[in-house]
Amino acid sequence: MRKQRFNPYLPSWEYIPDAEPYVFNGRVYIYGSHDRFNGHAFCLNDYVCWSAPVDDLSEWRYEGVIYRKTDDPLNPDGRMCLYAPDVTLGPDGRYYLYYVLDKVPVVSVAVCDTPAGKYEFYGYVRYADGTRLGEREGDWPQFDPAVLTEGERTYLYTGFCPKGDKSRKGAMATVLGPDMLTVVEEPVIIVPSEPYSRGSGFEGHEFFEAPSIRKKGDTYYFIYSSVVMHELCYATSKHPTKGFKYGGVIVSNCDLHIDSYKPAEKPMYYGGNNHGSIVEINGEWYIFYHRHTNGTSFSRQGCMEKIKILEDGSIPQVEMTSCGSADEPLPGRGEYPAYIACNLFCGEESVYTDLTGAWMNNQFPKITQDGKDGDEEPGYIANMKDSATAGFKYFDCKGIKSVKIKVRGYCRGVFEVKTSWNGEVLGKIPVEFSNIWTEFSASIPIPDGIHALYFTYRGSGSASLKSFTLCTD
């Protein structure tokens, strides 16, 4: 029997944001940066890889460390972090890993004979005279490399353009030769930054960071994070280095713009920067993105949703869900971990994870874990104060008669159970102080049908929620 698919799609103790998904030899491989649980900055860990068979996206396999930050000659002491990478299959049949260290403006390249083996440093992207791209006078710093190889040419997309920064004009496309390093066509701007977007069609969704590139048929899809950070947008063109037109938002990691179950501009999760891409797996298309956990921007986790590319090439925005890649709603019975919440909010509304700039902010409810980074401890929701709500989507409910929850913390109150974020309270589960995980339950019939489930804490103190169980007897 296959395992159930959830979001996040990897174990709850793994933190891989900025995912670039690829299918090689019947498996889906995930290349991303690697955050640290309780980390104080982005991308503190070495690159690791996970993969799954294309016909079973519940069976993710840890491939191990594929590249260490100290493998780059510019970083022998490891003081610089490995930022978001990308991988492409070169014309020689080898796999090339492109990345940027966090304190230099150049693109590094590593190579491997297999998708998830030990990559070895290969060189730096450079002009024909040997000058490294990003270091020539007039160059903009390179950031977040994305790559696509067609024949003997590799298209490299880079850029970082904070809102209001007139020194950066937009996302860049550079063409490399068959050695995978040498520039054969110099950088050109393909999507504008905010100061240069007037009349472009990108207004309000200008390029910020996180470029990614895919091709479907004869159409190039440029995926990127806009200046509002939480959304992954796309632009399309029939040419890899020009003519890109704004397409829309594919996903927001706070579910902004979605109006199918709430007001369009109401945030339903604590968002932040976003980075990911699209991929076709067994004839279906998916968007990979990341969410923020632990009350910080430095412990991000990968999520995925199924998308549709319509006949005209457009991609409608999708909701964040708990189902992830699952083809059907989750079964409306049994125990589910709280860390699969796709909605998390409280009475104090916020688009972003942390408005204070604090490390591991406790202003809002948050998904976290016990232990230290690398400990295989299951995630849970902490800091659920009065009005804190966790939402889970979607369940195929049939004959549910009661609901159990596992809670701990200095709390006294009730958890309200609903099938919509602002809907009728179907029942209440009383909870009280416990310093260990304790199960509480109540008779709460849930109507048959496909529903979301929302748990809202009402009371004093602060509760942590580990799981809930849907009971049919």
Swiss-Prot record:
Reactions it catalyzes: Hydrolysis of (1->4)-beta-D-xylans, to remove successive D-xylose residues from the non-reducing termini; Hydrolysis of terminal non-reducing alpha-L-arabinofuranoside residues in alpha-L-arabinosides
Site annotation Important for catalytic activity, responsible for pKa modulation of the active site Glu and correct orientation of both the proton donor and substrate: residues: 144
Protein's UniProt keywords contain Hydrolase: yes
Keyword terms: Carbohydrate metabolism, Glycosidase, Hydrolase, Multifunctional enzyme, Polysaccharide degradation, Xylan degradation
Record InterPro entries: Glyco_hydro_43, Glyco_hydro_beta-prop_sf, Glycosyl_Hydrlase_43_Enz
Annotated active site: 18, 209
GO molecular function list: alpha-L-arabinofuranosidase activity; xylan 1,4-beta-xylosidase activity
Pfam families on file: Glyco_hydro_43
Biological process terms in GO annotation: xylan catabolic process
E.C. numbers: 3.2.1.37, 3.2.1.55
SUPFAM superfamilies associated with the record: Arabinanase/levansucrase/invertase
Subunit architecture: Homotetramer.
Protein family membership: Belongs to the glycosyl hydrolase 43 family.
Protein name, as recorded: Xylosidase/arabinosidase
Annotated organism of origin: Thermoclostridium stercorarium
UniProt gene name: xylA
